[in-house]
From Swiss-Prot:
Record-linked SUPFAM superfamilies: ApaG-like
UniProt protein name: Protein ApaG
Annotated InterPro entries: ApaG_domain, ApaG_sf, Uncharacterised_ApaG
HAMAP family: ApaG (MF_00791)
Residues of the ApaG domain: 2-126
NCBIfam families registered for this protein in UniProt: PRK05461.1
Biological process according to GO: error-free translesion synthesis
PANTHER family: F-BOX ONLY PROTEIN 3, POLYMERASE DELTA-INTERACTING PROTEIN 2
Disulfide bond sites: none
Pfam family for this entry, one: DUF525
Gene name per UniProt: apaG
Length: 126
């Protein structure tokens, strides 16, 4: 664990995209807007992403790759980077979590933790 691991805060907002979902075909589309906030003293570049996505049936998929939405943004200190992406589940509920592989201005590699967040159709959870 690096001292820089806590220098990045990740906030998530999710939305169920009803008009592009097809529950009768077990296809539920969710968008998620991620805000990555650099609380550290150095710029940090997002190099990789690693997601674990689990639906209500326990089916898990893993997504790994370079950057996010085709970008590898450098986030200066005390600023934020935001993007929106999406995923399709076979169930009306699921959970996502993961990490961003980051590198600091000084060349130190560290992980920014993405805490588990829910993907759920409206009215499903009280």
């Amino acid at each position: 664990m690096s001292a820089l691991d806590n220098s990045i805060r990740v906030e998530v907002k999710t939305e169920y995209i009803e008009q592009q979902s097809s529950p009768e075909d077990e296809k539920y589309l969710f968008s998620y807007t991620i805000t990555i906030i650099n609380l550290g003293e150095q710029a940090a570049k997002l190099e990789t992403r690693h997601w674990i996505i689990t639906d209500a049936n326990g089916k898990t998929s893993e997504v790994q790759g370079a950057g996010v939405v085709g970008e590898t943004p450098t986030i200066p200190p005390n600023t934020a980077y935001q993007y929106t992406s999406g995923t399709v589940l076979d169930t009306p509920f699921g959970i996502m979590y993961g990490t961003y592989g980051m590198v600091s201005e000084s060349g130190e590699h560290f992980n920014a933790i993405i805490k588990p967040f829910r993907l759920a159709t409206p009215g499903l959870l009280h």
